[in-house]
């Protein structure tokens, strides 16, 4: 359910009871003999059985862990899902999902995705006999044309990384599901559970690199998967245990703690992200800004129809060349030049050389991932300090007395 009061900038109303669920679901003190209000970190690798083969819910920590169980329950509630599973990383979740398939099956993947996803599908999954097709899934006709009898899974991100292209999840679900037993996976890393619920829009699986916004503190590497299908859950739970790519109890504790501030963090990311996007759009040293919260974004209306807000991810093209982009990045003082995103700190990177370097150059050119495309992860610092930092770095990259390039 969603609240009646509209969110800022014309987006969907916020999901009801989000903060309450994040704080309380799966955290009940009554589940512990100690009545601990904060779920303890269960480091034990094994658990006593009452009799041979008779355990009290846990037997071996890879198969299930009390701390991980608390996290998975909380995430399921925030996604409006029946089930959630935690993995050692976002890519561990991706690998586990693809083990639902067999050699000869086809995966259709959005052409504009995280570089690690692209690399895994292109260079690893194909080695196991999976057929991979990269398609612009923002265009339903192209998605429809790519589906074959061998298609078993469609993988999309929305917004995409790094070009922030929005994809109509409902339209994709309609196209995919009319062909029968095809699984639609939505990578919801950028939006987080706070701004978008893919399952309610028709997706079969919602996945995250929880390393980013869901944890929010840049101190955990983790993946999450949420879903409603009992049969899919049972199979993924079996694969989670069989493949063994599970997170440590300490990481589960940290991510579970991160969820408690997800609402307040995402609101601030939205506020700061919008301010940065508006500042950059008005700056003469910037060629183009891509941010779904701006009216200038090609899918702005879709974003408002599908999401409750926008994260702090802002992409822009700086005027000039690679030299201008590098000079800008090297002169930033608050924004740290680093990969990853979604933490409380602001980060900046050059996708063509960093996060998406593994994507073939010809594909990068088609996707617009040029040497002047810069991706920002806008953090929680004071808004004016961030704007001042961007302003001075842009001036350093294009000094007023320098000849135009």
Swiss-Prot record:
<keyword id="KW-0663">Pyridoxal phosphate</keyword>
<dbReference type="GO" id="GO:0004123">
    <property type="term" value="F:cystathionine gamma-lyase activity"/>
</dbReference>
<dbReference type="GO" id="GO:0005737">
    <property type="term" value="C:cytoplasm"/>
</dbReference>
<comment type="pathway">
    <text>Amino-acid biosynthesis; L-cysteine biosynthesis; L-cysteine from L-homocysteine and L-serine: step 2/2.</text>
</comment>
<dbReference type="InterPro" id="IPR000277">
    <property type="entry name" value="Cys/Met-Metab_PyrdxlP-dep_enz"/>
</dbReference>
<feature type="binding site">
    <location>
        <position position="119"/>
    </location>
    <ligand>
        <name>substrate</name>
    </ligand>
</feature>
<feature type="binding site">
    <location>
        <position position="62"/>
    </location>
    <ligand>
        <name>substrate</name>
    </ligand>
</feature>
<keyword id="KW-0198">Cysteine biosynthesis</keyword>
<keyword id="KW-0443">Lipid metabolism</keyword>
<dbReference type="GO" id="GO:0006629">
    <property type="term" value="P:lipid metabolic process"/>
</dbReference>
<dbReference type="GO" id="GO:0005516">
    <property type="term" value="F:calmodulin binding"/>
</dbReference>
<dbReference type="GO" id="GO:0043066">
    <property type="term" value="P:negative regulation of apoptotic process"/>
</dbReference>
<dbReference type="InterPro" id="IPR015422">
    <property type="entry name" value="PyrdxlP-dep_Trfase_small"/>
</dbReference>
<keyword id="KW-0963">Cytoplasm</keyword>
<dbReference type="GO" id="GO:0030170">
    <property type="term" value="F:pyridoxal phosphate binding"/>
</dbReference>
<feature type="binding site">
    <location>
        <position position="339"/>
    </location>
    <ligand>
        <name>substrate</name>
    </ligand>
</feature>
<dbReference type="InterPro" id="IPR015421">
    <property type="entry name" value="PyrdxlP-dep_Trfase_major"/>
</dbReference>
<dbReference type="GO" id="GO:0018272">
    <property type="term" value="P:protein-pyridoxal-5-phosphate linkage via peptidyl-N6-pyridoxal phosphate-L-lysine"/>
</dbReference>
<protein>
    <recommendedName>
        <fullName>Cystathionine gamma-lyase</fullName>
        <ecNumber>4.4.1.1</ecNumber>
    </recommendedName>
</protein>
<feature type="binding site">
    <location>
        <position position="114"/>
    </location>
    <ligand>
        <name>substrate</name>
    </ligand>
</feature>
<dbReference type="GO" id="GO:0043123">
    <property type="term" value="P:positive regulation of canonical NF-kappaB signal transduction"/>
</dbReference>
<keyword id="KW-0112">Calmodulin-binding</keyword>
<dbReference type="Pfam" id="PF01053">
    <property type="entry name" value="Cys_Met_Meta_PP"/>
</dbReference>
<dbReference type="GO" id="GO:0019346">
    <property type="term" value="P:transsulfuration"/>
</dbReference>
<feature type="modified residue" description="N6-(pyridoxal phosphate)lysine">
    <location>
        <position position="212"/>
    </location>
</feature>
<dbReference type="GO" id="GO:0051092">
    <property type="term" value="P:positive regulation of NF-kappaB transcription factor activity"/>
</dbReference>
<comment type="subunit">
    <text>Homotetramer. Interacts with CALM in a calcium-dependent manner.</text>
</comment>
<dbReference type="InterPro" id="IPR015424">
    <property type="entry name" value="PyrdxlP-dep_Trfase"/>
</dbReference>
<keyword id="KW-0456">Lyase</keyword>
<comment type="similarity">
    <text>Belongs to the trans-sulfuration enzymes family.</text>
</comment>
<comment type="function">
    <text>Catalyzes the last step in the trans-sulfuration pathway from methionine to cysteine. Has broad substrate specificity. Converts cystathionine to cysteine, ammonia and 2-oxobutanoate. Converts two cysteine molecules to lanthionine and hydrogen sulfide. Can also accept homocysteine as substrate. Specificity depends on the levels of the endogenous substrates. Generates the endogenous signaling molecule hydrogen sulfide (H2S), and so contributes to the regulation of blood pressure.</text>
</comment>
<dbReference type="GO" id="GO:0019343">
    <property type="term" value="P:cysteine biosynthetic process via cystathionine"/>
</dbReference>
<dbReference type="GO" id="GO:0044540">
    <property type="term" value="F:L-cystine L-cysteine-lyase (deaminating)"/>
</dbReference>
<dbReference type="GO" id="GO:0019344">
    <property type="term" value="P:cysteine biosynthetic process"/>
</dbReference>
<dbReference type="GO" id="GO:0070814">
    <property type="term" value="P:hydrogen sulfide biosynthetic process"/>
</dbReference>
<keyword id="KW-0028">Amino-acid biosynthesis</keyword>
<dbReference type="GO" id="GO:0044524">
    <property type="term" value="P:protein sulfhydration"/>
</dbReference>
